Curated annotation (Swiss-Prot):
It comes from Panax ginseng (Korean ginseng). HAMAP family: MatK (MF_01390). The lineage of its organism: Eukaryota, Viridiplantae, Streptophyta, Embryophyta, Tracheophyta. This is Maturase K. GO terms for cellular component: chloroplast. Belongs to the intron maturase 2 family. MatK subfamily.
Length: 503
């Protein structure tokens, strides 16, 4: 019991990070800008134009205004007094929030780096890939029976997010600045335009706050999981495990000291796996329905009693994995039964053995993907290709390059699909949409345009993935064709593309 209590006690000896002076450093904003260029660029090449507005001159002007304290009046109610944000309010606010997100990430990065070094993990780049979750599911989920699909609740009050960072960052000035950003978009956590504006314009800060909030409750869950399971967490522990908890965990210490062993007996499960993606998580187990209901009540009580988050039991669904598909990151994944028959013979007697095993299957959901294409104006809601009117002012090569880029990214991201027919249909829609866009630009019909220039004009970017496989296996074209039909998971995909993100 003393070991458990030491684990849950608050340790603040390594949390004295004073980050506010970094707000006035120019290189912080340069780092934030480079991160935005490399990571958050849209697959559709359509952005808000922030890249064009960034310059060191604007950064110097921004820092000069912040040094003038009489101009730094953080009042969102009186527009006459708010001279700091009156001119270029959106640009300055976005630049400060992005720079602030880079600064607040420093304590988390230091903690993660020390954790990786202590556990002897030199490189963790592959763990960042979105596709790394699918080989894990392919290896584990086929042996499990039940799965909890959990819709993670979000804080209903902004101060909860501030309190989450309070024990990571011992800097009152930084926390006050964080409160200003949150209250400037006071309704960011509600489904309205203000919330959408905050999450889109301040993605890095938004994801940092959200992930730090998730880290709080997952750290407790992983602690319980490690104590109640014979299997120790490895990679997930590296990324999520944390020993710093805030004050209300002291109440949990008393509870665990009194009834810790009883609680663990109720949640005992030697085969249990947990995966989180976006705002959902999956808890897969080989246990019984009774055990899964116990975990459901545990999550609901943990959120409501210790994190003050209201969550109804209906947000957690118990499903049998072999007859239910999981909507995960643009894929429909399931562990379907794969029947097989084995013929055996013993002396003069022959017999047949029916054997059915669970096989992990991942397919591309065609209907949501067509909906994303229709929203992006590549087709209508029925999937009929249309021209992209906003691109008709571009040159022919630029139009083909943009369509080709989208098609290659979709092929790259959905390479793990076990059924390629849906992906071929998406390629056909993009190909015909590209032809219609070019024909509209030249005021011609698609048939006349392709007849004049040749149908091979649009072939190059639809066969890019096959060409890569042929270069990889030059002596065995049949092997490369079989490989192309199989699932391929890439470990260099660190962001989900816009069209696959139907959520």
């Amino acid at each position: 019991m003393e070991e458990f209590q030491r684990y849950l006690e608050l340790d603040r000896s390594q949390q004295h990070y004073f980050l506010y002076p970094l707000i006035f450093q120019e290189y912080i904003y340069a780092l934030a800008h480079d991160h935005g260029l490399n990571i958050n660029r849209s697959i559709l090449l359509e952005n808000a134009g922030y890249d064009n507005k960034f310059s060191l001159l604007i950064v110097k002007r921004l820092i000069a205004r912040m040094y003038q304290q009489n101009h730094l009046i953080l009042s969102t109610n009186d527009s006459n007094q708010n001279r700091f944000l009156r001119r270029n309010k959106n640009l300055y606010s976005q630049m400060i929030s992005e720079g602030f997100a880079v600064i607040v990430e420093i304590p988390f990065y230091l903690q993660l780096k020390s954790s990786l070094e202590s556990k002897g993990i030199v490189k963790s780049h592959n763990l960042r890939s979105i596709h790394s979750i699918f080989p894990f599911l392919e290896d584990k989920i086929s042996h499990l029976i039940y799965g909890l699909e959990i819709l993670i609740p979000y804080p209903v009050h902004l101060e909860i997010l501030v309190q989450t960072l309070r024990y990571w960052v011992k800097d009152a000035s930084s926390l006050h600045l964080l409160r200003f950003f949150l209250h400037e978009y006071c309704n960011w956590n509600t489904p309205n335009k203000a919330g959408s504006s905050f999450s889109k314009r301040n993605q890095r800060l938004f994801f940092l706050l959200y992930n730090s909030h998730l880290c709080e409750y997952e750290s407790i869950f992983i602690f319980l999981r490690n104590q109640s399971s014979h299997l120790r967490s490895t990679s997930s522990g590296t990324l999520l495990e944390r020993i710093y908890f805030y004050g209300k965990i002291k109440y949990l210490v008393k509870v665990f000291v009194k009834a810790f062993q009883v609680n663990l007996l109720l949640l005992k499960d030697p085969f249990m796996h947990y995966v989180r993606y976006q705002g959902k998580s999956i808890l897969a187990s080989k246990g019984t329905p009774f055990l899964m209901k116990k975990w459901t009540y545990y999550f609901v009580n943990l959120w409501q009693c210790h994190f003050y988050l209201w969550s109804q039991p209906g947000r957690i669904c118990i499903n049998q994995l072999y007859n239910h598909s999981l909507d995960i990151l643009g894929y429909l994944s399931s562990a379907r039964l794969n029947p097989s028959m084995v013929r055996g013979q013993m002396l003069e007697n022959s017999f047949l053995i029916d054997n059915a095993i669970n096989k992990f299957d991942a397919i591309v959901p065609i209907i949501p993907l067509i909906g994303s294409l229709a929203k992006a104006k590549f087709c209508n809601v029925l999937g009929h290709p249309i021209s992209k009117a906003v691109w008709t002012d571009l040159s022919d090569s630029d139009i083909i390059d943009q369509f080709g880029r989208i098609c290659r990214n979709l092929s790259h991201y959905h390479s793990g699909s076990s059924q390629k027919k849906s992906l071929y249909r998406i390629k056909y829609i993009l190909r015909l949409s590209c032809a219609r866009t070019l024909a509209r630009k030249h005021k011609s019909t698609v048939r006349a345009f392709l007849k004049r220039l040749g149908s091979g004009l649009l072939e190059e970017f639809f066969t890019a993935e096959e060409q890569v496989l042929y270069l990889t296996f030059p002596r065995a074209s049949s092997a490369s064709q079989r490989l192309y039909r199989r699932r391929i998971w890439y470990l260099d995909i660190i962001c989900i593309n816009d069209l696959a993100n139907h959520e």
